[in-house]
Amino acid sequence: MREIVHLQTGQCGNQIGAKFWEVVSDEHGIEADGLYKGTNDQQLERISVYYNEIGANKYVPRAILVDLEPGTMDSVRSGPLGGLFRPDNFVFGQSGAGNNWAKGHYTEGAELVDAVLDVVRKEAEGTDCLQGFQITHSLGGGTGAGMGTLLISKIREEYPDRMMCTFSVVPSPKVSDTVVEPYNATLSVHQLVENSDETFCIDNEALYDICFRTLKLSTPTYGDLNHLVSFVMSGITTSLRFPGQLNSDLRKLAVNLVPFPRLHFFMTGFAPLTARGSQQYRAVTVPELTQQMFDAKNMMAASDPRHGRYLTVAAMFRGKVSMKEVEEQMQNVQNKNSAYFVEWIPNNVLASQCDIAPRGLRMSVTFLGNSTAIQELFKRVSDQFTAMFKRKAFLHWYTQEGMDEMEFTEAESNMQDLVAEYQQYQDATVEEEGEYEEEVIEDQE
């Protein structure tokens, strides 16, 4: 079967990852001790994508937990699923990266990376036909960002033909953890553009807004935010974990969503989102789901899709949904909002369906959009980066770990190129394509 090896790095990555495994284990009927207690055969049909079967009815996640300090991993170990993971798959240092990307990427992280790669190899060898890796991390810190991107490039070297898919928490404009976030994020994006195949952008501020506005939580905790992220992760991977047709593996997903290799940063969304108290008072319909899914308030990255155009979209419906109705609704959205979809990629909106709905819902949908509006997110980080970098603020933290200013300049220009590329395809029209071809013919004559 097509297995996926899951890595979680840094504090953020480990917390999101732990939540993800809670949700997935619950959906597959796997208890905290790894024993299968489910009722539905479909739960086991493609269980090997994420789990190793090690005995009669006992399953262990293909997860590798990495951090440069023991704290977060201790809390995962003492959490509800602590006994589920393989003890050898906890790889941690003692020093911490102190939110310093250079420490994660060049000094502290580089010392630990071989130990992690050994575990990666062991997991990869235990698979039948590995389809790829997924990694959860944040881009604003030291370990998840610095060491996370180091791991990605090392794994890329060793498994060049396997998919690399990242769930990346991007620093948000208003909620900031550390002052050097723009540096760490820019250096990370510089790596992700080159080494990742699919990056799902998640952003704390957008998650806060959803918790606050839609879920009516007055003081959202990180637990609530991570719960939202785990919905999306579970939804994105549904088509990989349960029998289904479309986007049934990471590569097919990428082929459908990535028109140009560098533009692989997706916005994610989930519906239905309702306040906890009012869930049982409404029946969700496909039109409602489709409406909410395309709603800007539903995006888990702080950029507004109405400011750009969708290059491609994938929607994964779950539950007992009529595919005919889904197709009609999706077509409906495209017809009404045709200005927001590029017209030079025909059939750029795809929908897939899986019978098993998430716990507590009759039907749900997960949204993935490759929108040119994601440039807002990079532009914002880039502006903050430039403001600090032109004063060379805080640079000594990085240079004393052996980094060069040149690397900052490179990362900055790579990110600006990325923004420009998104803008170029946002402005592109079918006519331009035609004009371009005519010019080529004239040149040849």
UniProtKB/Swiss-Prot annotation:
Biological source species: Schizophyllum commune (Split gill fungus)
Protein name per its UniProtKB record: Tubulin beta chain
SMART domains, alphabetized: Tubulin, Tubulin_C
One Gene Ontology biological process: microtubule-based process
Role this protein plays: Tubulin is the major constituent of microtubules, a cylinder consisting of laterally associated linear protofilaments composed of alpha- and beta-tubulin heterodimers. Microtubules grow by the addition of GTP-tubulin dimers to the microtubule end, where a stabilizing cap forms. Below the cap, tubulin dimers are in GDP-bound state, owing to GTPase activity of alpha-tubulin.
Statement: the UniProt record of this protein carries the keyword Ribonucleoprotein: no
Top-level taxon of the source organism: Eukaryota
List of residues binding Mg(2+): 69
The encoding gene: TUB-2
Keyword Transit peptide: no
